[in-house]
Design a protein with these regions (language model features):
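Helix-to-loop transition at the C-terminal end of transmembrane segments
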Residues: 47-67
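Short acidic/glycine- and proline-prone juxtamembrane loop motifs at membrane-interface regions
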Residues: 156-169
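Extracytosolic helix-loop segments that constitute the early lumenal/periplasmic catalytic or substrate-binding loops
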Residues: 64-88, 95
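Start-transfer (signal-anchor) and selected internal transmembrane alpha helices
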Residues: 1-51
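Transmembrane-helix motifs of polytopic, lipid-linked glycan transferases
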Residues: 117-138, 176
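Alpha-helical transmembrane segments of multi-pass integral membrane proteins
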Residues: 88, 115-122, 166
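Juxtamembrane segments of multi-pass membrane glycosylation machinery
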Residues: 75, 80, 95-118, 138-141, ...
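Short helix- or helix-capping micro-motifs
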Residues: 44-45, 144-155
Length: 177
């Protein structure tokens, strides 16, 4: 039912040239476009931070093992790198381990809340960079704004902020490259 309503709404908006009028307005009003974009990004940030603070989830499985390996590395315990150690088995985690190792000097060991809130910040900036990329490609401003609005509605990515994996950071660094 939701899909049918969404299709009907898009059909109505296209048929009545509402998208064209909105895009024309946004193209002529830079301040309005930036204000709407920033409000949408703030909504994504607030919803992500609220999710992180309300769930208070702790790392488990791989997330914990990488944080544990970073702590061990800072304390001279290299068992995670030895034969059958976690990092020796899962070398794909070395990038995340390096980031957690460096930042761990500042925020401490097993600081789940910091990493989760950092994920929220990276999600917000990823959506901003998506918007900037669409501007560089000279796509209509409505496309740039629609991407961020759909980001508000796409809960799985925001909910993913509680997982301390490299996916959020990877997409963030990939879009900023």
């Amino acid at each position: 039912i939701i899909l049918v309503v969404l299709i009907a709404a898009v059909f109505y908006l296209v048929r009545n040239n509402i998208f064209t009028r909105i895009n024309s307005y946004l193209s002529n009003n830079e301040k309005t476009f930036i204000r709407i974009r920033n409000i949408c990004l703030i909504i994504i940030g607030i919803s992500g931070a609220a999710w992180v603070l309300l769930t208070q989830s702790n790392a488990g499985a791989d997330q914990y093992y990488v944080l544990d390996a970073a702590r061990g590395l800072r304390n001279g315990d290299y068992s995670a790198f030895r034969y059958n150690g976690y990092i020796a088995k899962y070398t794909n985690q070395i990038g995340l381990l390096f980031i957690e190792y460096i930042i761990g000097f500042i925020v401490g060991d097993y600081n789940y809340l910091f990493w989760q809130l950092l994920n929220v910040v990276m999600i917000v900036f990823t959506y901003k960079m998506f918007s900037d990329i669409l501007e560089i490609l000279k796509l209509p401003r409505i496309a740039s704004l629609s991407t961020i609005i759909l980001g508000i509605l796409f809960f799985p990515w925001t909910l993913y902020s509680v997982f301390i994996y490299g996916n959020v950071a990877g997409l963030f660094f990939a879009t900023s490259a």
